[in-house]
Structure formats: C-alpha cells, structure tokens
UniProtKB/Swiss-Prot annotation:
Disulphide linkage map: none
EC number: 3.6.-.-
Gene3D superfamilies: P-loop containing nucleotide triphosphate hydrolases (3.40.50.300), Probable tRNA modification gtpase trme, domain 1 (3.30.1360.120), tRNA modification GTPase MnmE domain 2 (1.20.120.430)
EC top class named in words: hydrolase
Encoding gene, per UniProt annotation: mnmE
One example of a Gene Ontology biological process annotation: tRNA methylation
Cofactor list: K(+)
Organism listed in the record: Prochlorococcus marinus (strain MIT 9215)
Subunit structure of this chain's protein: Homodimer. Heterotetramer of two MnmE and two MnmG subunits.
Name assigned to this protein: tRNA modification GTPase MnmE
Amino acid sequence: MDSIVTTEDTIAAIASAISIGKGGVAIIRVSGKDSINSCKKIVQTKSKYAWESHRVFHGFIQENKQNKFIDEVLISVMKSPNSFTGEDVVELHCHGGIIIVNKVLKILLSSNSRVRLANPGEFSQRAFLNGKIDLTQAESINQLINASNTRSAELAFSGIQGEIKKKINDIKNDLINQLCEIEARVDFEEDFTDFDYTKYLKNIKKVKEKIELLIENAKRNSYIHNGISIALIGKTNVGKSSLLNLLAKKEKAIVTNIPGTTRDVIEINLTINDIPMKIIDTAGIRETSEQIERIGIKKSFRKIKESDFIIYIYSLEEGFNEEDKKIIQEIPKEKLITILGNKKDLIDCKNINSNELKNTILMSIKNNDGERLLIDTIIKKCGLKQVENINIFLNERHLANLSACLSNLNDTDEIIKNKLPFDLLSIELRDGIQNLSKITGQELTEELLDNIFSKFCIGK
C-alpha cells in the first residue's frame, strides 16, 4: 500500500511482558495521530531532542498539573510513516513493576479523551492495513511471541522476514503465467487445437508438488510449535507409569505390582530434542467390574483418539497375545504408533518369536535400556528427524488455503481429462490464485481479519 490508513482514535497498551508482575523496564506503546500530543501532556522533559523522530530522550511522568512526578522514563518517538504501524508511534520506557506501569497507562488514558486501550493485536493490524507487513508476517510475530522452543522461534522469525510470502508468491506467479496463456486464447477466441496439454499438465504438476511439500511441512512443523501428544497405552502392569517416570526423570506416577494402580490420566509436559512433548499415562486396559477403574479405561480410549502418537506397551514376559491384538485393533489406522516390548531384562531375547520382533522396540524401562531408541523412533515417525529442512511455519489457516488451491489444480486436470470448456480452466486457476492471496492477506474480509488479530496479545 502506498497510502497510510488513518483512524480517528489513538491506541495505547503495555507492549512488554509483565506476566510475573515485575521487571527492570516496561514499555507502553502509543500509536495514532494524537500519540505525540497525548504523551506531551503527561511527560516533563528538558531534552533538546524531545519529540524528534527516531530519537530517545529522558523525562518524567507527571500525574497532575502540580508537577507531581510518579516515574522517570525514556521516551522514543517514531513519526509516520517510518514506524511499525505506519502511524506516529511513541513508546514510554518506565520502570517494570506492575503497579507503576499500570499507573502510567492509567494517567495517559485519563488525560486524553482521544486515546483508548488497544484491542488484542491492534498494533499489528494497523501495520498490516498500512502495508508495513503482510498477513503472514503479522501472524509470524504472534507465533514468535508464543514460541515454546528455540526451533519454533526460528521458524517464526523466518516468517517475519517474509519467507512464507516468498514461497506463496512463487507458486502464485507460476499460476498467473498459466492463467495468462489460457485467458489470452479465451479472450481472442483462438482455436485450442494447438494448445500444448502435455506442457500445461507438466507445469501444473510442478506447482502441485510445491504445494504438497508445503502442506507436508505444515503438518510436521505443527509438532514443532504445538508439541506432540503421546499416549502410553497397554494392559495393566506393563510399565506405562514407569516409562512416564523415566521420561520425566522424576516420579510423577505411582508404580506398584498391583494391577489397576493408575485409574486416571496423568499428563506431563517435556521438551526432548527441542521438541515439546506431552506424555500421557493412561489406565491399564483390562476387563474389570470395578467402577472407578472402568471410568479410567474409558478415558484411556478417549486419549487414543485425542493424541498424535501412541506408544503401545506390552510385557515381553507374557508375549504379544490376542488381548494385545484386540486393543491395537481399537486404535484408528491413521494414528502414528510404536509398539514397545518391555521387560527385556527378564527374558532371553533370542527366544522371542521373529514375528513379534517386527516393528517392535525392545526395552527395559526399569534399567533405562532403550530410551534413546524410543525417542529417535518417535521423532522419525513424526517426520522430524531433519527439522532443519523445515524453514517456515504454516498455521491451520495457511494449510486450509493451500489445500483449497490444490483442489482447484486437481479440478483443472479433470477439466482437461473430460474435455470440458476451456473457460472452466480459467475459473479454477483464478480461484486457486485467490486462495493463495488469502494467505498473505490480499483477499480477506474485515470480519476474518478481526478474527485473526483478536488472537494476538494486547500491545502487539
């Protein structure tokens, strides 16, 4: 955008993290056409650089006209259009205690009728509307703020630098080139008998491969940011709670030889290989008349459906029997699963049936023998063995629009295959381009934009 979108009101909010209630410095951000004048009303300063753009100067916050100072601050000014939002922006750097920062914000709001508290994500929304950032960059800022590990933060920062936009525009340009050739023929009513269908299908196949790779990466990098939920499933006394304690490096679950000890779900959050994981210990599955235990078993099956990954544990002493097979048949086919044979220290592994060994990890949870292999297997099956190859983070909104575009391109294949009118090709390509444009924010309704930015924190 070349022009700056102006709004009648000026917004203000605490822009720094204050979740623990105190810190060395807190920042109050003010944006809008009245930001400088509103701050002048509450700031006393003798600096010769006062209120110049891209200057930081010293001052005091004044509570009333009696010159009662309540805090000593640094003030930075960024005048339109050279600011994050594209508007005039002032940032007040005050001391970080929750009491004082709220006091400064209250004084600012009460002294200026044209200044109001910002809505969640409103600073970023104004930056987007003023063309300072595209929608993927705005979402990446929120992603970075909420990153739960360093890899997630790295992926978010690549989005801030415009990597998502680059990949989407690359695909979009490919489709625009195809659309131009087709529409030129439609507009001039040229004969399509000499149209190179093979070349077109080859080009579209390349575009679809790019989209499919992004979709595949989107599924994997969701694990990086949101974590992998892993349910420990199996019969009673096979070592589920012991495995939970082993992974947690502390006793989180009670372990006894009495069947049915675990009657409720126990969850712990860990970070392994810089990937967040939620480990879920469930009640042992068996036939029982005990009501509380039966409730726990129902929860076990519920967690099977809710989890990303299943570790099915059985005892090598007992072997993998019909009861185990029956339980595994209850696990949805699409679920990622690893079968773990526990208590290898109690048997001679040479005597294990070769069919039982297939796709099974042998482990002694008691002796911590096999933990590394188990973790490596989880990471490999989740497609995270080479996370360095994943260089952008795509969220569910991006994924939905990419999938819609892919559907449009598949429809063009059907149009050619069934020799349908050529103008239908143009329609599908236009729809595909529109779905890609929604990702960067070029084709979105105001209502949808409000919904996206409402998920941001206040102050960003």
